[in-house]
Every structure is written in structure tokens, then in C-alpha cells.
Amino acid sequence: MPVGVEARASWRVVALTLLLLPAVPAASQPLPPRPLQPSMPHVCAEQKLTLVGHRQPCVQAFSRVVPVWRSGCGQQAWCVGQERRTVYYMSYRQVYATEARTVFRCCPGWSQKPGQEGCLSDVDECANANGGCEGPCCNTVGGFYCRCPPGYQLQGDGKTCQDVDECRSHNGGCQHRCVNTPGSYLCECKPGFRLHTDGRTCLAISSCTLGNGGCQHQCVQLTVTQHRCQCRPQYQLQEDGRRCVRRSPCADGNGGCMHTCQELRGLAHCGCHPGYQLAADRKACEDVDECALGLAQCAHGCLNTQGSFKCVCHAGYELGADGRQCYRIEMEIVNSCEAGNGGCSHGCSHTSTGPLCTCPRGYELDEDQKTCIDIDDCANSPCCQQVCANTPGGYECSCFAGYRLNTDGCGCEDVDECASGHSGCEHHCSNLAGSFQCFCEAGYRLDEDRRGCTPLEESVVDLDGQLPFVRPLPHIAVLGDELPQLFQDDYGAEEEAVAELRGEHTLTEKFVCLDHSFGHDCSLTCDDCRNGGTCFPGLDGCDCPEGWTGIICNETCPPDTFGKNCSSPCICQNGGTCDPVSGACRCPPGVSGAHCEDGCPKGFYGKHCRKKCHCANRGRCHRLYGACLCDPGLYGRFCHLACPPWAFGPGCSEDCLCEQSHTRSCNSKDGSCSCKAGFQGERCEAECEPGSFGPGCRNRCTCRPGVACDPVSGECRTQCPPGYQGEDCGQECPVGTFGVNCSGSCSCVGAPCHRVTGECLCPPGKTGEDCGADCPEGRWGLGCQEICPACEHGASCDPETGTCLCLPGFVGSRCQDACPAGWFGTGCQMRCACANDGHCHPATGRCSCAPGWTGLSCQRACDSGHWGPDCIHPCNCSAGHGNCDAVSGLCLCEAGYEGPQCEQWCRQGYFGPGCEQKCRCEHGATCDHVSGACTCPAGWRGSFCEHACPAGFFGLDCGSACNCSAGAPCDAVTGSCICPAGRWGPHCAQTCPPLTFGLNCSQICTCFNGASCDPVLGQCHCAPGWMGPTCLQACPAGLYGKNCQHSCLCRNGGSCDPILGQCTCPEGWTGLACENECLPGHHGAGCRLNCSCLNGGTCDRLTGHCRCPAGWTGDKCQSPCVSGMFGVHCEEHCACRKGATCHHVTGACLCPPGWRGSHCEQACPRGWFGEACAQRCHCPPGASCHHVSGECHCPPGFTGPGCEQACQPGTFGKDCEHPCQCPGETWACHPASGACVCAAGYHGTDCQQRCPSGRYGPGCEQICKCLNGGTCDPATGACYCPAGFLGADCSLACPQGRFGPSCAHVCTCGQGAACDPVSGTCICPPGKTGGHCERGCPQDRFGKGCEHKCACRNGGLCHATNGSCSCPLGWMGPHCEHACPAGRYGAACLLECSCQNNGSCEPTSGACLCGPGFYGQACEDTCPAGFHGSGCQRVCECQQGAPCDPVSGRCLCPAGFRGQFCERGCKPGFFGDGCLQQCNSPTGVPCDPISGLCLCPPGRAGTTCDLDCRRGRFGPGCALRCDCGGGADCDPISGQCHCVDSYTGPTCREVPTQLSSIRPAPQHSSSKAMKH
């Protein structure tokens, strides 16, 4: 080893020793920890790399030319020549390499303290930055771990905590909505529900408590989840069932009116039918006594009736046809109208004074009282609303275009052309008053016909090719109802019925009208027929058209008839009325159908049964008005009004029976009468008895005997002549009294008596001396001389009027008809008050309630526990866990119960109302049959007991903590510790004994080679250098240390020690990590062997083999190249001819004697021979000199100046003078001897055989060297290549693009395609096809030969080469099978959408589809004010200028307003946004609904109105300044000035005249007073 190398090696050893030696501790310091060794506990080995620099030798060389002596220099034996010499020398370079060394450190989680044998102290990793844990950090012996608080779970990094979304599992156990929160969750309920005590179940709450149930006025709770809206008095509910509008005062109980009600300026004004007049209360109607007022004009007697009167005649007389005159029966009547119609132009009536001319309706008598002239009815304010046309004898109403005549014949109503479908509008129709208007959708315009619509972009084409013209606007057509076919009955029968109904009486002598007149007084002619009526053929009456009746067709059909002569009966039901012409039914609100057969269902009313009513206790509402049916004595929208005067009972539908003139008031509940002074009796019908007076006749008179007292005041009367009374005796005795002082009482049983004698004057219907007896059965009238009609249904004849007195429940002239539905009582005048489908008795009106209802008016729903009609059946839900259906009686069980009588809990696994909800409890938990709440068994928790107890807890509700060591879990039910593998003992406090492991330490360890056993899993902890389950395997190559976990640092194929990791280097390498190559001259393992190469050969550092320089060979490079070879590895062949050898190094030819040239191919020049042609010939002139030997003649077979040329074929011998004698071309002669031998390419005894394939040359001894199927010339060995190849030995394939013999043809294949070098056939690449690969694959094919089918979907394009899919816009995936995910669009979904405000983008173009409330290219704009919804198309309906939410349209009310549309102000006492803030004002003081400031009343001020106005201020809030002069103060409330110092006037600035000269007093005292 050279000295330098040895020195460097020694230095490295010293350096390594210094590194390994521990520092010597000072005597004053404590001993440091002992150096760590691999055998110490918790010590881990590590590899540490260091960078080491050293000098590396390298061999260099240079060349130079030096003079050398050479021998054989021609004439001289030696001469000096030039020779190139190479000099080799050694140099050094500085190189750096990394060296690895093993160091020992404490394993992670351990540390070494002074004096410890190894690493025995645990490191508390949690003390430093909490160990990196996000949650709690738990230190363990030799390590640590992170935990998370409840509601969080540990992430994969073992440190980060992530919130657990409990709502993802079973909705968190929540019945309605689960809301996740950090570390926990909570349950929420839908509107109308509240959270149960279990925190999960939702219970229904009163729906009225949420926003007043949406009601504008009042919310009435019906059930827990149902309510109805109710309006304040004078308001009615709209169709939406929430808002209220002011209702007509006539809508409630007919406005309190007995007969008719008319609304004027918001107030109800009552009216009465003919024959009645308003009572003093301006509501009730009382009969007009036409007899008493002299309006009857009866000839004999007058009998007053309800609403009318009737004339009666004395005995022996009979009532005339006019109903007033009386005629003796035996008197012959002379008809004054018989001659010339009495001179009348129209009607003539015979009277006792002569003919009386009358005119038909629409005419009036002229001044001659004979002639009838037409009345211009249109000039006298007719009922026509729009157009009036006067006609002879009448007038006709009509309407403008677009209107049609109402059924009353007067009013006009607009024709809704749009609703009838006759508008002809193509798109939209808008009805106008009297007309309509068509309009088109966006993007269209109205055609010239004003009906059709044409797109804006379309041009108008003149279809008929004529000039354009302007079309007039269409006239608006009035649509009339089509008249059905009319029915015609026998007119005679109808006339008889009419006559019977009129009750006319004819004389015994029947007379016949003459001169084509008719009527009861023969005063009518055919000219009197009205309303289109025509005369009968006999000219004896009018034939009326449809809808008219009467003797001259001047009366519309009665309500229950229609058609011609009113002969067809109406078939309208439920109170519907029929058109008198067509018979079409007009249904009242709440009823529908062609015949009004469809009434409104319960809870609805109105014309189309669309209005919703909400009556208390499920009460039924009036089908017309929606009003609730009230208890007796009450009426009105909310039954809050007392009955009007003289009405009582349910719905105030019964009339009081009191004598109103004698009565103070009538009880509204039971109809009892309170009498005025002077009257008594149940109906106050009787005056006080003589000797009593006053209210109820309870006071006794104090007059002397024989003197009567006033029954009202009790005053005593004076003595008057019989039949008279009064202070001046000018008054006749009142009815019922007679005699002196009218003291006698008539004993005429209510009939009047003669005022003087007391003789009874019996009224009609009475007879006898005291008029106490009624007329005999079948007789009536004065003197009981009239015969009663045939009354039906047990009715009797009124002895006074002769009318049939119908029993309650019947009506009609003969009581032949039962009361119509909804009416009862005497005369069917009382309206039934039965609600909710109840039926009333036609006589008594008593309600028979439908199932589920009870009460006098069936307005009260069945009480709990009863059901059926009138609620008479008791419920049989005896278990007490339910009620029964009020209609069917079926038990409606409470939540959690079922069975016919609700006696059973829900079957196992079900709960709730109807036991229809399925329990979701798990792990054997019991389910509450009412709420579904789970009661978990021990060891389980959660809403559905789906979670086991968390680690460390057990028992019921997991409320007990486990007492187990080492983090061992415990049994969730019993709490007993379940020791993990490796632990044992009652509390798992002990680790397994040595050589045992697993659960209960029951398994035996199987570890070898000094390994220890893991007490938990039994895994072997191998000693360094070993691995495997049982530590039987040594570390594999490249690994070392404990568990073979360290990677060796050995390089260049070096192997390391499996325990310590030290490197063992392979041949050719050295160093700590085998990173250094062997130095020159050294080789083998560790470079310890020396090389012995000669002749400049170099040594291989791995094998030691010599790498020889050019020209040398052998193990040690000791031998030159063999003859004919030269160069590196002696692999090059010499190119020398004539048997010359070449230089073994350079390859230069060493020519034999006689030859020269670079390849020794030339003979010596003439005159020269021998080696290097250096010798001159000495032959005679002209003689040849042999170029080798110098002889002066050529040897046989050669010729030429230098004998260098062989004999020509066919010659031989010396100087080639002899001709060959060999037969044929297959023979050749030897050039020297002439012997015949086979020619090149032939062989055999007769030289006739060609050389076999693969051989050539003389005797076929040479082997052909042609490749790739090439053939060789049998004579010369030249190769003939097949198609596709070329070259001397056919070793080269045709270059690309060529083919065929000698590669002469050019390929014609397409780009990228190859062609067969032999045939030129095109070999197509994948994706191409065709003879020249000129075509691509079809669209659905790909690959080589287009053999494979594409799998692209959704219009994707397939790559023809490899089948990969190119997806269209909006699709992605290997096969374009996935649409772009949300937020992406375009090609391969690579573009990111730019839509804002949660707008979604169209996956193809990226166009934004905006959600409700936004618009714009990127949905960046919020809907403009007043619009909301999708596309901002919906208009906000907010009032008070309030904006609306652009998304939902919800009105954002300003301060001071509330309601769905901000239509309501704050309730008194509330203010601010949403009217949620309560005013801080005293009771009765309102506050500003916006600011909440108190609105102080006049005279008060301050924030709470607790201060009086300061002087000089008055009014509300003391905001006004007083305007008082003369030092006067003003009233703080009204501002009125209180004058002082004689000042007067409204502002105290006027001085009286008498004081004007008096000088006013100085004002300083007043100033002092003011100042004081």
C-alpha cells in the first residue's frame, strides 16, 4: 500500500475512534447517562449518514513521437525512424461520499434519566401542545392517544375531531325535524306542534296561538289542530275563510225588519208589504185597519183582515162583483153597460149611478171620462235601468249592447262574453262593462279582427291577393237564453182554478157579456190584452204568451208556475225560483243543479258552495248568508244581538202574540207580554176590570160608588147621559161599555153593544143574544149567512172571514198544501231554526236533529259520551280512553289505544293515533303506546335504543360508570369488566404473565431467537436481525435491526449485517456504504486483491480480469493477436491479400515478399522483388523478374512483367503458353499443370452437378453466407436477395416506404400505415381501414381492423384508435354516462358555473337557471320591488307600500302594520315591527303604532302621559300653543281661554266699551306673580 493511502486510512480510524469514545465527565458534574446499547430496554437503532471527503487516484496518459532505431532499412542494417509512444501517469482528485453509521436513541415515548440502564422514563407527550390533539390527550406508558368529547369522533390522523351528525341515523330519533349542532343535536317540531318532555316526540298545540290562526279578526279553536275564523259584528267572512268584510245590515236577520229590508248609506231601513205599515219601532209591520181608516169604502160592513180587508153585506144582500157594493138578491139588475158599452171605449162597469168607464193597465181616461188614452209610462220614472220603449198600454225595458235584461224585467246585467265562450279571443279575454276585449300573450300582437293573435316576427300576408282593407270592430252580441219547448194545458181548467182562488160570487141570475167584451164587469175587450197576449177565437178573452197570466195577461206567472198560460208547474227545489218564461231554475246561494237539487255541504255556503263558514260547535250555517243559527232570543252574525221588538224564539223567527197597542214589551226568549197601564191578560188583550187601573191593573180605584175610574190613571169620571162620557160628555162610550158614564159592561163576549141600551151588535161569525156563540159549522159572516168553502186537513172555517183556518203545518186557500221545507206553524209563516241538516215538525217547528247534533235548533254538537240523532245514544267506549263519533257512534280512541271500546293498548310494535305508527325501538326496547317513546333496556340508549352504552358506562340509561383499569370496557348491562387481551383480574389491572397472551391470558407464546411476546395479540417482538410471526426468519437482504425495520445503506450491491447493519461490500467496491470503487491495481471483495496485467492492460475491479489494449490478448494481456486479427479484443479481421499478415495493434498489412499496397494487393513494380519490393531484379533486358524470388522467368501458371497475373482461362503452363484440354464449361484446367478439375460451382466425377444449395466455389467446398432466405451464386458465392431484403448478405430489410425485389417499389399506404416489405400489402394502424388505410373507422367502431364496438353514451364520440370517448357538452365519465355535477358545465364538465344566489346552470351552455327571487345572466340581481317568485313574474300583494320577500312573496310589513298583506294596523297596546312590542303607556292611552310613543290625550304630556300641560299649551300631547290674550290661561284640554281682568272674547283680547276709558293697571305685579 502506498504511504499516502496508509496515512489516510490511519487518519480515518483515529477519527472514528474519537467519534465513538464517550466524553470523560468532570469531577464536579453528575455522571451523565450511560451510553445506550441495543440490549438496553426501549433503545432503538438508527442509521446516521455523514459526508466524508478523500483523494481518489486516477490514471492519465499522453502521447509523443520519439526517434527509434529500426533494422532492415534496405542498404543499411539500422536506421533511425519515428515512433509514437504513450506515457501513463497517476494523478488524484478530491471526491466526497456519504457514510452511514449506527446510533442508538430512546424509542419514541421514552427518555433516559441519569443513572438509568436504558430508556426507562415515560415521556408525557400530552404536556407539549396537548400532543397535537384537538380534543383531550391521554398519556400512556410509552405513548399517548387522543380522544374526542361526546358528539365528536376521531379522524383518520388520530388527532383531529369531527362533529358526529346524529341526524343521519334514524333522524336522531326526532319525530319531525332533527337539527345537528356542534357536538350534539336537537329536535324541532312543525308549526302547530310542540316538543314533548322526551325531547323527541311532537304534540299538537292550539292552532290559534300561531299568528292568530291566519284570521283577520277572531280565531275560534275547534279541536287541538283545527280552528275557524270569525269576524267581528257587522262583518262577514270572505271566501278565503280568513279575511272579513263589512256586511250589509240587511244580511243579519233581515236587518231586524219584519217584512222587507233595504240598505241606505250603510243602515237598514225596513219596509212593509201592501196592507201593512211600520210600527213605532220602525222595524215591525202592523196591519193597516182599512175599515177603521175609511179606506175600504164598503157599502154595508167592513171586515179587516191581516194585510187587507173584506166587505160584507147585511142579510138579504149579496156582494157585487166589485167586492164593495151590496145588492138584494131578489132585485133585477139593469146593466147600464148593455147599450153601446155604456159609451166607454174600453171597460164598462155597471154601478148604481150608471156606467163607470175603466181603462186597461197602461191607459188613462180622457177628460170625457169615456175614452182611454195611452200613458207614456217611460216619462213617469219606470223601472227600466237603461232603455225604455213606450208601447200602447204599457212599456218595455231593454238593455244596451253587451247587457241582458234581468229576470225582474227592469235591471240590466253585464254579459260576460269571456265566461260564455262566445268572445272568439284566440289567447286571452278580459270582460268589460257591456263589452269585452281580447289581448295576446307576450310575443304576439292582435289581428285586425281584434280577436286573433299573430307572432310579432310573422308578416301579415294578404291571403286573397286583394288590396288591404280595414275591418270594422265586431259588434258585441247580447247572448240570450234559449227557450225550452213550452207546454200548454187546458185553458178552461186553469180559468176555473183562478176563479176559485179569487172566491168570486155571482148573482143567481147569471149574465153574459155582450159585444165581444169580457171580464167580471164586461169592461174588457181584446184591445186590453197586454204583454203580447192575443184574443181567443171567440174574442172572449186573452190568450197569454209564456210567462204571463191574468184576464188581460198583465200578471206574471205565480212563483210555482211558468210557460204558456202559466200552465207548467215549476220543479225547482230547495227554494229555487223558476223563470216565468222558460222555467229555468234560479237557485239561491248555497244550492246548485239544474233543479237546485244540490245544496251546499256542511260547512259551506254561497252561490257555488265555495264560501266556508265556521260556526261554533260545528253549527250549521245558513245556506244563503252563511250566518250561524242562534239560541232563542238572539240573532246576528255572531248571535250577539237581541231579537227586534215583537219577535222572539230561535232565530227571532216567531212573532209575539201580544196586543202591541196594549203592550210595553215582549220577552225575546219566550214571547211573554209586559202590559201597559190599563191592560191585563197573557196577551194584554183585556182592559182593567172596573175598580182597578194601572200597569197590570194592580191598583184599586178610590171613586165613589157609581163613578167609574180611568183604567190608566185611576182618575174618577163625571156623570154623563147614557152612552157618553168625558168632561163635556162629548165622547161616546168606548167599545164594550154602555149606559150612564159608560159604566155598563157589555156582555157580548167581545162583540160591541149599543152604547145606550147595551144590546149586542154581533160581528161577523158570531150569533146569539150575547154574541157568545160562533156561527154554526159550515156558516160564516154577518148573521152567519155565508157558506164555508171545503177546507182540508182538518182545517176549520173562520166564522168571521170565511177563510179556512189551517192547522199548524198547512197552508193554502183550502189548507190543501203542507208547509214547504224550512217553514212551519200557523200559516207556515215561521222559519225553521233547525241547523245541521235537522228537520223541523211542520206544525210545532220542533227540530229532529241529524246524527251528531242536539238542542232546540240542532246547533249544539253532541256532548262527550253521546251520539246519534238528537244525541240520544250513550257512547259505549267504556274504557275511558276515547270518545265516540257523534254521527256513527264508533269509538274514536285516544292516541295509544284501540279496540271496539278503546279498551286495548296498541298492539306490540305500534303506537299513536289509531295505532298506525310503527315503533322504531331496537334491541328489545319497549315502546310507549301513546307517544312511541322507547324505554331502553340496560346497556342501551338513544331515541330508538339504537346505541349501546358509550365506553365506560353501563346499566339503565347508561347511568353507571365502569370501574375497570387500562381502559377496559365493562358489560353494558351488569358492569362487569371485560378485560382486553393481555389483561386479567377483577378490574383488569394486571398484565399477562410472561409467555402468555390473549383473552384471560390463556394462550401460550411461540416466539424464538430471544424474542419477547406481546401480551395482547401474542405477536412476537423479534430481537434485532429477526422477523416473522415467530421470529424464525432472518432479516431479508436490505433490512436490518429490530423487526428488520431499518433499511440498509449499503450501495452498489453490498450486503449488510442483519443485526447492526454493517456493510459487506462486493467485488470492486469499498467504504462504509460500499460507495467507493477499487483503486487501480486492486480488485475483489473490499479491493483487497492486486492485479498483474501486462502490456498496458487494465484490471476489472470486480473480477480482476485484465482488459487488454488493442492488439493484445490473454489472461494477463501477455499475447499479441493471432495472425489475421488485430484491434481491441483482437476482434477485427485483417484485410490483407496474398497471404499477408497485419499488425496486431493497428491492423496495418505486413506484405510478404513480392507484394505491396495497403492490402498487399499489388505485385512489386517491374524491376523490383522481395520483401517490401526493396530488391532490384538482375534479369536481362526484356526478361520477366519474379516479384517474389527475383528469378528471371515466371513459374508455370503465371505471366506478366512481374509474373503477377494468373493464366487466362483455357491456358496453363509456363508463360501460359499451353491450351487446356478439358471438356465443356463445367471443367477448368489447373493453370500450372493443366490437369482438368471441376469449374467453380460444379462437382462430381464428371463435374456435371451443380453445387447443392448453401455451397459454392471450386469443389463446392465454400458455405454460402446469405441471410433471410437469400440464395448464393454457386460459382462466386454472391447473394441473390428475396423480395423485401437487400445487402451483400441480404441482412438488411427494405427501408420504410419500400418493398419488393431490391426494394425497388414505393409503398402507397396512407399516413401512419406500414406496408409489407415483401408484398407491399398495407398494414393499417388502429382506427384505419381500407386497401390503402385511407378510411377511418365507422362512428361506432374502433381499434385494429375496426373490430371493436364503441361504448360511448349520450351522443359521445368514440376515438377510432383506442375507443376512448369524447363527451358532448354537459356529460362526463369514461363512457359519457354521467351528467355534469352541480356547479360544472361544458366539455368534460371542466368549466365552473358562475351562477349566484343558488342558481343552477344549464350543463351544456352554462346558462343560469335562477331560483325564485332572482334574475340576471348570473342570477346576480334580486327581483325589483313589487315582484317576487320564479322569474320575478308574480306581483306582490302587500299594502301600505310594504315590500315583499323576493323569494316567497311574504310581505315585510313596516312598523305599525301586520297581517298577511300588511292590511291591518297594530292592535291597541302594540307597536313596531310585526306589532310585537307592547306599548309602555297607561291604561286607555294609545301609543303610536310605529314608534310606540304614547299618544297622550288632550291635557296630558310626557313619555307616559303622566304630566299636565305646562302653561300656554293644550291639546293632545300638549302640542298646541294657547292663543289667549289679556294674561288669560287656556283650558289644557280644549284650549278655551279663561279670561281675567274683564277681558272678553274667544281669545280674551276684547275690552268692554264701558271700560275702554279706564286705564289698565300696571303689569309689574302680574309679572311678579308670574315670576313667583
Swiss-Prot record:
GO-annotated molecular function: calcium ion binding; scavenger receptor activity
Naturally occurring in which organism (per UniProt): Mus musculus (Mouse)
InterPro entries in the cross-refs: cEGF, EGF-like_Ca-bd_dom, EGF-like_CS, EGF-like_dom, EGF-type_Asp/Asn_hydroxyl_site, EGF_Ca-bd_CS, EGF_extracell, EMI_domain
Primary location: secreted
Alphabetized UniProt keyword annotations: Calcium, Disulfide bond, EGF-like domain, Glycoprotein, Repeat, Secreted, Signal
Covalent S-S links between cysteines: C44-C107, C73-C79, C106-C119, C126-C137, C133-C146, C148-C161, C167-C178, C174-C187, C189-C202, C291-C302, C298-C311, C313-C326, C418-C429, C425-C438, C440-C453, C522-C535, C529-C542, C544-C553, C566-C578, C572-C585, C587-C596, C609-C621, C615-C628, C630-C639, C788-C797, C791-C804, C806-C815, C832-C840, C834-C847, C849-C858, C871-C884, C875-C891, C893-C902, C915-C927, C921-C934, C936-C945, C1001-C1013, C1007-C1020, C1022-C1031, C1044-C1056, C1050-C1063, C1065-C1074, C1087-C1099, C1093-C1106, C1108-C1117, C1134-C1142, C1136-C1149, C1151-C1160, C1173-C1185, C1177-C1192, C1194-C1203, C1260-C1272, C1266-C1279, C1281-C1290, C1303-C1315, C1309-C1322, C1324-C1333, C1346-C1358, C1352-C1365, C1367-C1376, C1393-C1401, C1395-C1408, C1410-C1419, C1432-C1444, C1438-C1451, C1453-C1462
Residues spanning the signal sequence: 1-26
Origin: domain of life: Eukaryota
GO cellular-component term (any): extracellular region
Residues in EMI domain copies: 40-121
Entry's localization field: Secreted
SUPFAM superfamilies on file: EGF/Laminin, Growth factor receptor domain
Protein name (record): Multiple epidermal growth factor-like domains protein 6
Glycan-linked positions: N1000
Domain EGF-like residue range list: 122-162, 163-203, 287-327, 414-454, 518-554, 562-597, 605-640, 785-816, 829-859, 867-903, 911-946, 997-1032, 1040-1075, 1083-1118, 1131-1161, 1169-1204, 1256-1291, 1299-1334, 1342-1377, 1390-1420, 1428-1463
Pfam families, per the entry: cEGF, EGF_2, EGF_CA, EGF_laminin, FXa_inhibition, hEGF
